[in-house]
Amino acid sequence: SPFSAHEEKLILDLWAKVNVAACGGDALSRLLIIYPWKRRYFEHFGKMATDQDVLHNEKIQEHGKKVLASFGEAVKHLDNIQGHFAHLSKLHYEKFHVDCENFKLLGNIIIVVLGMHHPKEFTMETHAAFQKLARHVAAALSVEYY
């Protein structure tokens, strides 16, 4: 594992408290509000003309939950993140044609959201551990691109 035992504990302890639906919906909504041109990937999700549309779009909330649940799978596979995300990398590259830069952007937004939802637990050490995790997840999802 690229993570020390201490980093793994920090990640697992915080993750046990995460509300995946709330944080996932929040993270994906933020991505689409901060970077509105990213909405083109989700045009089939219905109305997203305004920020309020994005915030109240059930399909965005649902997909955000799915995305964060997938991020949570990395937490369960800290010793083999790349292997675990091989299929998703291929899918995003071949089928969805998602720019791999989005994985880094969303990873950073997930970190912001975790900090907002868990301000007391989100110490600098925990932040650093999750930043490392987000880097590894983004790299694993980008494998097919290079």
Curated annotation (Swiss-Prot):
Database matches in CDD domains: Hb-beta-like
PROSITE patterns per record: GLOBIN
Cellular component per GO, a single term: hemoglobin complex
Gene Ontology MF: a single term: haptoglobin binding
Keywords: Heme, Iron, Metal-binding, Oxygen transport, Transport
Leftover remarks: Displays a pronounced Bohr effect despite the lack of the His at position 146 conserved in the beta subunit in most other vertebrates. Shows chloride-dependent sensitivity to organophosphates like ATP and 2,3-diphosphoglycerate (DPG) but not to inositol hexaphosphate (IHP). Binds molecular CO(2), not bicarbonate as reported for other crocodilians.
Subunit structure: Heterotetramer of two alpha chains and two beta chains. When oxygenated in vitro, exists virtually only in polymeric form. When deoxygenated, forms tetramers, octamers and larger polymers.
Similarity remark: Belongs to the globin family.
Name of the molecule in the record: Hemoglobin subunit beta
Origin species: Paleosuchus palpebrosus (Cuvier's smooth-fronted caiman)
